[in-house]
């Protein structure tokens, strides 16, 4: 298994990855993304991120280590092994930033 840390952005009124909250040991399925978009973003104390846009679920996942991602792009099963304290970031509307550490594996 490979470890991958991500930031999951979602509107407070919508569910993120189909769940309102994450706990260590949780598992969930993510469809293979149709498109990988590379870009840079600067948010508060964070530095650059690369974003993965999963259009089917309208979820934005910001990958902390994009060089690691190619080893995971054929995987579709994710398991949560760490959840950081959520942070609130204001950008035109209220968005919750939840940092989640994941493991990827073939389902």
Curated annotation (Swiss-Prot):
Main localization category: membrane
GO cellular component, one term: cytosol
Membrane topology: Single-pass membrane protein
Transmembrane annotation, as ranges: 52-72
Keywords: Membrane, Transmembrane, Transmembrane helix
Cellular location(s): Membrane
Protein name, per record: Uncharacterized protein YDL009C
Organism: Saccharomyces cerevisiae (strain ATCC 204508 / S288c)
């Amino acid at each position: 298994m490979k470890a991958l840390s991500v930031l999951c952005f979602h509107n407070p009124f919508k569910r993120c990855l189909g769940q309102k909250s994450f706990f260590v040991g949780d598992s969930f399925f993510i469809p293979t993304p149709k498109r990988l978009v590379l870009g840079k973003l600067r948010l508060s104390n964070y530095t650059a991120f690369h974003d993965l846009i999963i259009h089917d679920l309208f979820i934005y996942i910001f990958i902390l280590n994009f060089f690691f991602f190619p080893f995971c792009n054929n995987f579709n099963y994710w398991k949560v092994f760490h959840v950081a304290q959520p942070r609130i970031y204001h950008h035109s509307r209220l968005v919750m930033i939840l940092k989640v550490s994941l493991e990827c594996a073939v389902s």
